[in-house]
Amino acid sequence: MQGRILAVALLLASPLYAFDRQDFDRIADFSVTIKTLAGLSEAGGLSGRLLLLDGTVASMQFLDAAEASFAVELELAGGEWIGTEDVKIYLCRVRFRGQEYFRRFPRRAPRAPGPSEILLNDRILVVARLAGRAVAEDGSPLWVLEGLHVRALR
């Protein structure tokens, strides 16, 4: 009986060996950063692809605080030094929707945050896809992404 189960498992897993790097690169792009996003005027080849971004949670706006329809929008910031005195900041927004994120983004910062909780000023890693454009407070264009997975880098 165990031999049959193993044989079925191997048959079901065999299509996974057919995937190669080119197949993966068609659905994901891990080379994109917040800086490269800020420089894009159009989605181009990134439309529909998964992006892996890291940055700091600069702001958190709760669009819907009810658990059943929870929605939060993060402003994700990255930056770089220009010389020794200037810093250039790059921003994008990431929206997370669904009750699975309700406990990940507490409205009030706990004294001892759990490992899965995301707080303001946390450095995070996000898997997301482009959802559109918005305008920042200073009038500059800003990419908005649909967040799929998030993890704190502590």
Predicted regions and their residues:
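Sec-dependent signal peptide recognition
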Residues: Q2-V8
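OB-fold and OB-like single-stranded nucleic-acid-recognition modules
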Residues: Y17-R154
